Amino acid sequence: TSNRLMLRANVSPSTVTGIEVSGQDQPFGQNAYSRTSEQTYRDVAGTAQDTWSIGTSKVNEFRFQYARRGLSYFYNTQIPGGSDPAVNIPGFAYFGREPYSYIQRIETRYQFTDNFSLSVGRHNMKFGGDVNYLPLTATFTVNYGGVYDFGSFGAGSLGFVNPAPNSLPNFPDLSPVQSYGAGLPGSFVQGLGSPSDKFKNIPIGVFWQDS
């Protein structure tokens, strides 16, 4: 008999800043720097494998893997305005906190795999199994920072009614920029409640083959 042991480790960090998002009708080119976001990955993985040869006709392979992925998606933390409530002025400007931020997710994997190979006469058989345990936690705070939408605002909504519509022009409506200057949002959206959740997944697989 003989044994061969293999160990492997991987680390993969990544950080991307200045991301422009087009969700919720945000067109590229109209997002201010404060509306950009940043995404961070921190991936770590390790594997240990033992290959056990038993005589000339039997081989057992056992492998354990641990892997962890940490994901963070945040509003712009480089300037104070990145955490302010989001302001949408369609056709003109989008600034303040990115509505989809922040997101935090951690996925961990524990994997156990064992395969046994056996040669008997003209048959080469192999069977084994695989068990995974994957706990996951996630936080998703869409619109939790608050979103103000500014659009056109009718003059009639402010009490400006044309007393003689047949002879006098109507009062002009406020443009989205004028509505923002007047502090008159058309809507306000705010996410509420617990944004966090956690769950686990346990996939199990077995196989047998003969050739």
Where are these regions (language model features)?
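Short acidic-glycine motifs
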Residues: T1-S211
